[in-house]
């Protein structure tokens, strides 16, 4: 940061030298005609234009004057010079145009304007040594690229001059010397000697900084390469347990057998499963394909359930084989034969139990309770047409009977074969004298 600031001040000094040479020629020609000099005071209001006070460092001025051992804390003195001789002009032309000669030349002209400028423009000047490193890190308030318009105004209006310390400000009155003395001549010679060194140093500065910049850039690149990046830390794999203890935030990948991977997949379902064994894959697909067939049939047949309820009412809550399905699908499973055998045995047991039981043939039932259900269920189930005769004059129901078989009062239940058609059973319904009009309506609707 300091080198960049010094380079910027060097560029400003070169512009000031060119403008001062032009001013000196103009002032030498027209000085006799004009009483007041054209040179403006040496106070540059940086805080007015750019919002902050920035001046050249005191360390730079001390380097430009290394041979000034008698007065190390010499303050800047301004002297008024009424008449300029040719010797002064020649000396000024021979001198290299550097800041030190400019200050000595302007000391003789601007003594009168010093007090007015100090009263009108009180400026608090700061130096690079007095600042901390945090202030150097902040960006500069003035722009890096100077436009021509700003350069002309700043150069014509003012020139920057540093103040060394508070002690120099306090000892200004004591150090002011008369206009023409031997001390002034000795000081000018010393300034000449110091300016030669400063010129050499300024030229060396102009050449050296690029090397320093390249070295700094190389060093910064090496430092950036050496610094551990957070992305690389996440990618690196620890080889020992000590690395995990030192840096517990490092990401680790467990290189373990495939069994641990399957246990972890149960916890995170979003991760894909990768298989390495072909036999395991085949078994998995087979189980997924055939497991639905191995499950029990849990679907409900509503028609069979209703028929079973009707038969329960008819046969006094005794089960019958009619409620069960006649045909069942053979499931293609691994144990299909065993399942089929068990089903056949259960059916045989149920049919044998029904045949062994004796049911009373002369049983009469109340038609008001079961007429509607019987007329709906049994007509479609036995695949026969039921003939209903009705006398409209007497409003009484006649006998329901099957057409083909002879009329009998017994209900016979024979063992049912698995692949046979429904049985042809005979039901006889007797007439009742205790009928109501509501029963007639039910009979008509049925």
Swiss-Prot record:
User: Secretion signal: which residues?
Assistant: none
- InterPro entries hit by this protein: DUF4545
List where Polar residues composition bias occurs. Answer: 156-169
Amino acid composition bias (Basic and acidic residues), ranges on this chain: 182-199, 213-227
- Annotated region (Disordered) at 63-95, 155-232
Q: Which Pfam families match?
A: DUF4545
- What's the protein name? Uncharacterized protein C1orf141 homolog
Q: Which organism is it from?
A: Mus musculus (Mouse)
Q: Could you read off the lineage of the organism from its UniProt record?
A: Eukaryota, Metazoa, Chordata, Craniata, Vertebrata
